[in-house]
Amino acid sequence: MRWRLLYGLMMTIMFFSHTVVAALPTWERPAFIENAFFHVALEYEFTSTTAPRLAKWSHPIRVWFRHDVGHQALHEEMARLHLAHLAQLTHLPITVVARRADANFIWYFTRQSEWQKIIRTELGEKALNNIYGSVCMFGVKLDPDSHEIRRATVIIPVDQARSHGKLLGCIIEESTQALGLFNDSEQAYPSIFNDKTPDDFLSPLDIILLKLLYEPTLTSGMSPSVLQPLLQQLLLQYQQQGKLKQALYQSRHAPIVEQFGR
């Protein structure tokens, strides 16, 4: 089977009435959320496309961890806490398996001296063109017909991530992006997908984007023109049901936040 490979990375960049809408935080406005969704879910870092399509998982995710460095229990605890939160938000079955052969989501905790070799092996030679200034990386393989995500890889060089104060950020951002929110964009704020956001944890906007992505009415392969009316309908429902406001609580009380704090 042919695969389409997409990859992304964390960069070290330092740096409806009108009355009701005006009173809302920017991230809570439906039009802002819709725009952010299109920029984050329908565009790809380092890969251009003239026919963007939605991509998501439709099968259970089975994660296998490869540890090349110490503090294995701590690193895996962080990852498992975040994976549990992702499963809760998306309703995807996400489990950890003991054998690589049983996994469709490979997660490396490695060292900087090894990560280029791992990237070359797992993501291909071309992925090495985009590592300048990066801290960690993810890649996914898509079914070319359905556009469903079939496999994913997360690669975190722990020493490099720690030196930038980004270990938690790498764990959260790369695994979240590997679910289908591939692109970093300044159109999303506050968000882990915006390098100007100071917080490494999922924001309320991120939670809404994840929930939208895994709504059953949105399916892999959908084009922007098909998605737009469905998104608008969902956002109206979210607003009426209080889901937009609930996202703030879910962000503040994420398992990894309660364990490791902001």
Task: For the regions a language model picked out, list residue spans one by one.
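Disordered inhibitory propeptide/activation segment of secreted metzincin zinc metalloprotease zymogens
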Residues: V21-R62, V69-H71, V135-L142, L248, ...
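Metzincin-family zinc-dependent endopeptidase catalytic domain
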Residues: V69, H75-I172, Q177-A178, F182-E186
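Metalloprotease/metallohydrolase-associated module, dominated by Zn2+-dependent proteases
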Residues: T47, K126-K166, F182-R262
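N-terminal signal peptide c-region/cleavage motif recognized by signal peptidases
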Residues: S17-T19
